C-alpha cells in the first residue's frame, strides 16, 4: 500500500489538507498543545523583539503532521516579518539558495522544510549565511574563478525535519534553538477538532470531538482529515450532527479502529505476532513479510506504534508487546 493512500497518513497529500491552512493558529496564544515549546518560544521571541534582533536560527523536528510549518508561520507572525518558504529537495543548486537569501529583508524568516535533504553543495553555502550573515559565491569558472562575499541582512532560518538524525553535525550545531514536537494528547486534539468543526460550520458534540481525537494518532493533520470524513458520513447517513456514536460508526466504516490503527498498522503487528511468534524479527524480514519498504516501516508505521507501547525496538529486532497481543484478543506466550 502506498503511504499517500492511507487515510491516516500524516503526509500532506490531499488537496483538502491545503485548506487546513485557513484554520491553523496564527499566533502563540492560539497555539494548542506542545506546552514546553510554546512557553520557550514565547520567551525567545519576546527577548529578540526587545533587543531588536532577528530570532536565533530554529530547528523543529518530530513526526509528520504535528505542526512544524504552522509553528514557522507563528514565529514569523509574532516577529512581524515576512516568511519565505522552500524545501530541501527544491534547492538543487547553490544559486537557488543564494537567490532566496539575497531577497530577504532584515529579520525575515526563511523556512526550509525537509532540511535533511539539502545537497552538500547547498549546505556549504548555508554555513556562512547562518553564522556570519554572509554569502560566499564563486564567480566564473576554471583559473579565472574567484570568490566574492555578499553581506546579508540578519535573518532567521527555520529548518524542519522528520529525521533529525540525518542532519550533518555542522548544520545541526548552527541552530541556536532546537524544538522537538511530540504527539498530541487527546484533550488537546479534542480542542483542535472542535475548533475545526466550528470553522467548518458543523454541529458536533464534545464526545463526538473526543471520539475523533482518540483515533487521530496524536496528530492534528490526521484529526482534521478524519473530521472531514466523519462529516461526509454524518451528512449522508444522518442529519449532519456529529455525536460520539456517529463518529464511531464513520471511523469503523473507514477501518480506523479505537487505537487509531488502520489496515497497515494491524498488518504489521499481526505479522510480528503470527509469522514471527511475537518477535524479535529483523527489519528486512518484517519488510518482506508485509510487502513494504524498510524506510516506510521506520519512518511511517513504527513511530506511533512504539510511542503507544504496541511495538518494541530491541538490539535483536522488533517485538510485539503484551498490549499488542491483547489488542487482537490473542493470549501472549508465557515468558520463560
UniProtKB/Swiss-Prot annotation:
EC number(s) given by UniProt: 3.6.4.-
A Pfam family hit: RuvB_N
Residues binding ATP, per UniProt: 23-24, 65, 68-70, 131-133, 174, 184, 221
UniProt binding sites for Mg(2+): 69
Ranges where the record places region Large ATPase domain (RuvB-L): 4-184
Positions of region (Small ATPAse domain (RuvB-S)): 185-255
GO molecular function list: ATP binding; ATP hydrolysis activity; four-way junction DNA binding; four-way junction helicase activity
Keywords annotated in UniProt: ATP-binding, Cytoplasm, DNA damage, DNA recombination, DNA repair, DNA-binding, Hydrolase, Nucleotide-binding
Residues where DNA binds: 294, 313, 318
UniProt cross-references to InterPro entries, sorted A to Z: AAA+_ATPase, AAA_lid_4, DNA_helicase_Holl-junc_RuvB, P-loop_NTPase, RuvB-like_N, RuvB_C, WH-like_DNA-bd_sf, WH_DNA-bd_sf
SUPFAM superfamilies: P-loop containing nucleoside triphosphate hydrolases (SSF52540), Winged helix' DNA-binding domain (SSF46785)
Reaction equation(s) it catalyzes: ATP + H2O = ADP + phosphate + H(+)
Localization of this protein: Cytoplasm
SMART domains: AAA
Keyword DNA damage part of the UniProt annotation: yes
Broad class of the protein's primary localization: cytoplasm
GO BP of this protein: DNA recombination; DNA repair
PANTHER family listed in its UniProt record: HOLLIDAY JUNCTION BRANCH MIGRATION COMPLEX SUBUNIT RUVB, PTHR42848
Description of how the protein assembles with itself and partners: Homohexamer. Forms an RuvA(8)-RuvB(12)-Holliday junction (HJ) complex. HJ DNA is sandwiched between 2 RuvA tetramers; dsDNA enters through RuvA and exits via RuvB. An RuvB hexamer assembles on each DNA strand where it exits the tetramer. Each RuvB hexamer is contacted by two RuvA subunits (via domain III) on 2 adjacent RuvB subunits; this complex drives branch migration. In the full resolvosome a probable DNA-RuvA(4)-RuvB(12)-RuvC(2) complex forms which resolves the HJ.
Domain characteristics, as noted in the entry: Has 3 domains, the large (RuvB-L) and small ATPase (RuvB-S) domains and the C-terminal head (RuvB-H) domain. The head domain binds DNA, while the ATPase domains jointly bind ATP, ADP or are empty depending on the state of the subunit in the translocation cycle. During a single DNA translocation step the structure of each domain remains the same, but their relative positions change.
The protein's role, per its UniProt record: The RuvA-RuvB-RuvC complex processes Holliday junction (HJ) DNA during genetic recombination and DNA repair, while the RuvA-RuvB complex plays an important role in the rescue of blocked DNA replication forks via replication fork reversal (RFR). RuvA specifically binds to HJ cruciform DNA, conferring on it an open structure. The RuvB hexamer acts as an ATP-dependent pump, pulling dsDNA into and through the RuvAB complex. RuvB forms 2 homohexamers on either side of HJ DNA bound by 1 or 2 RuvA tetramers; 4 subunits per hexamer contact DNA at a time.
The family this protein is said to belong to: Belongs to the RuvB family.
NCBIfam families on file: PRK00080.1, ruvB
Identification of the protein by name: Holliday junction branch migration complex subunit RuvB
Gene responsible for this protein: ruvB
Amino acid at each position: 500500500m502506498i503511504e499517500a493512500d492511507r487515510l491516516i497518513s500524516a503526509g500532506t497529500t490531499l488537496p483538502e489538507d491545503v485548506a487546513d491552512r485557513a484554520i491553523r493558529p496564527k499566533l502563540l496564544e492560539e497555539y494548542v498543545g506542545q506546552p514546553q515549546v510554546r512557553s520557550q518560544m514565547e520567551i525567545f521571541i519576546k527577548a529578540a523583539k526587545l533587543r531588536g534582533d532577528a530570532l536565533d536560527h530554529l530547528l523543529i523536528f518530530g513526526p509528520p503532521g504535528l505542526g512544524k510549518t504552522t509553528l514557522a508561520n507563528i514565529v514569523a507572525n509574532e516577529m512581524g516579518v515576512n516568511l519565505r518558504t522552500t524545501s530541501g529537495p527544491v534547492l538543487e543548486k547553490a544559486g537557488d539558495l543564494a537567490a532566496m537569501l539575497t531577497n530577504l529583508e532584515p529579520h525575515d524568516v526563511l523556512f526550509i522544510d525537509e532540511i535533511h535533504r539539502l545537497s552538500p553543495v547547498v549546505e556549504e553555502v548555508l554555513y556562512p549565511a547562518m553564522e556570519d550573515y554572509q554569502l560566499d559565491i564563486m564567480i566564473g569558472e576554471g583559473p579565472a574563478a574567484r570568490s566574492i562575499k555578499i553581506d546579508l541582512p540578519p535573518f532567521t532560518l527555520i529548518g524542519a525535519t522528520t529525521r533529525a538524525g540525518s542532519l550533518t553535525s555542522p548544520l545541526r550545531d548552527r541552530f541556536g534553538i532546537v524544538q522537538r514536537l511530540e504527539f498530541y494528547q487527546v484533550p488537546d486534539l479534542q480542542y483542535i477538532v472542535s475548533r475545526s468543526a466550528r470553522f467548518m460550520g458543523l454541529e458536533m458534540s464534545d464526545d463526538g470531538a473526543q471520539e475523533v481525537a482518540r483515533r487521530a494518532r496524536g496528530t492534528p493533520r490526521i484529526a482534521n482529515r478524519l473530521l472531514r470524513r466523519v462529516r461526509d458520513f454524518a451528512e449522508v447517513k444522518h442529519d449532519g450532527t456529529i455525536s460520539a456514536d456517529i463518529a464511531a460508526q464513520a471511523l469503523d466504516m473507514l477501518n480506523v479502529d479505537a487505537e487509531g490503527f488502520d489496515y497497515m498498522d494491524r498488518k504489521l503487528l499481526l505479522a510480528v505476532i503470527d509469522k514471527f511468534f511475537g518477535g524479535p524479527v529483523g527489519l528486512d524480514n518484517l519488510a518482506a513479510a508485509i510487502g513494504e519498504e524498510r524506510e516506510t516501516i521506520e519512518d511511517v508505521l513504527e513511530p506511533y506504534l512504539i510511542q503507544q507501547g504496541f511495538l518494541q525496538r530491541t538490539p535483536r529486532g522488533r517485538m510485539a508487546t503484551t498490549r499488542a497481543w491483547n489488542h487482537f484478543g490473542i493470549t501472549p506466550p508465557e515468558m520463560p
